[in-house]
């Protein structure tokens, strides 16, 4: 549409790989899918078997115990639909020159100890913060739920074909 605007464009070294666009009524989150970018295209794969291996779960996040959600556990999905999962199970990363809150949670990084002392004296950082040379923290896995949609569509098609075969028998 003529009123569509691109707000963010994601690129790799060769191509645009995604965009965030809006028009007068909607937001689009786009991943490149043009046929000219693809090879080895196959329409023959068993989506139902893969989909049946997934284990949807009900859960809440530790940080929000009042909200129950339906979803997946990333490391369980990674062996079935690896293209949908980012990160590695139990991964951590080490940060340098870190300021921690009083409860030990991450606050800010790349602050020298001298700058931290100065900022505390100026009141920029709370007195109960702590500076550490290195701090290890979890690097959490994520799931791109949109990567599951083709499996859902293909499974519906496979089940429709099975139903038709049974009805025609």
How would you name each of these model-derived features?
Residues 32-169:
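Intramolecular chaperone/auto-protease modules of tailspike-like proteins
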């Amino acid at each position: 549409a003529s009123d569509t605007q691109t707000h963010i464009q994601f690129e790799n070294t060769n191509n645009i790989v995604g965009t965030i666009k809006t028009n007068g009524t909607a937001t689009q989150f786009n991943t490149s899918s043009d046929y000219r970018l693809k090879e080895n295209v196959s329409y023959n794969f068993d989506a139902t078997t893969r989909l049946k291996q997934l284990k949807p779960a009900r859960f809440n996040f530790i940080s929000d115990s009042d909200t129950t959600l339906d979803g997946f556990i990333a490391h369980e999905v990674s062996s079935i639909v690896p293209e949908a999962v980012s990160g590695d199970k139990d991964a951590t990363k080490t940060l340098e020159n870190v300021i921690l809150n009083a409860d030990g949670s991450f606050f800010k990084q790349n602050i020298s100890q001298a700058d931290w002392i100065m900022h505390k004296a100026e009141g920029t950082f709370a007195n109960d913060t702590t500076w550490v040379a290195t701090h290890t923290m979890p690097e959490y896995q994520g799931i791109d739920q949109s990567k599951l949609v083709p499996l859902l569509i293909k499974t519906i098609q496979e089940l429709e074909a099975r139903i038709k075969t049974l009805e025609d028998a």
